[in-house]
Amino acid sequence: MRLPIEKRHVWEAYQAVRLNDGTHGADMEDWVAFDRRRYHNLFRIWNRVSSGAYFPKPVRRVFLRKDDGGERPLGIPCIRDRIVQEVLRGVLEPYLEPHFHDSSFAYRPGRNAHQGIAQCRTNTDYYSWCIDLDIRGYFDNIPHDKLMQAVVHFC
């Protein structure tokens, strides 16, 4: 099923991303430059995304210092890519959200870490064991082919 991308989706995404402000990506385009041709830029985003011809730009890589002295890599997408990500989140979320587990709290609307902690406390009433694990680099190693199969299946 091909989900329609409407111009209003792009406008709403722009407004949400613009509120966060944020710095430039690898293309060095800041908000002043983007807003100078805002309507042209938003139309191009809509045109390319809705026709399947949008391709993201490279991500700017920066490193944040960690308390232990190490560094954590952070990828900063360009403004256009952040808008496209928000468009896709807004369009896909209503289809995918009902399929997530009730005990899943990360990056979900109306859910937060405090609710996750409360769920953990509730779970301790029923279980006498706990598994604590951290998959290093998990998001960098998600098999995208399987992820896309799941998205297509639920949309």
Identify the function of each model-found stretch:
Residues 1-155:
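Non-catalytic terminal/accessory segments
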